[in-house]
Amino acid sequence: MTEPFIFIGAYTIKEGKLEDFKRYWPEFVDFVEETEPRLIAFNAYLSEDGTEVGIVQVHPDVSSMEFHMKLIREHVEHAFAEFLDRGTGMQIYGPSSDSALEMMRQLAGPVPLTVKPHGVGGFTRSAAEQAHVVS
């Protein structure tokens, strides 16, 4: 089984734009869910004070991430123009490609980009929400 490609990005939300971001995000999530059937997980988490957002993506492989980046380019540009001030850190876990790393470096700019390409074992449950506990 191929190891997943995991991306975690942290971004500062522009002052006064939290509510606008919170209205925009569900529309963006719907777009991603409808157009990217291979994407395993796509979630955002706000800091306690609402000044930062962390975005976590789990892809089955790097080609899924490459497709994602090409598909959402305009959405990313819109988000930075309207809601997001800057990135504060990016992390990549799992096997990557030169083209994916280059896209991530361009997106990161001066922000630290941590890459950990070598998995040492684990598992992925893509149907975990359907599981149930037997007592």
Where do the protein language model's features map onto the residues?
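Short S/T/G/P-rich N-terminal loop/turn motif that feeds into the first structured element of a domain
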Residues: 1-53, 60-74, 83-135
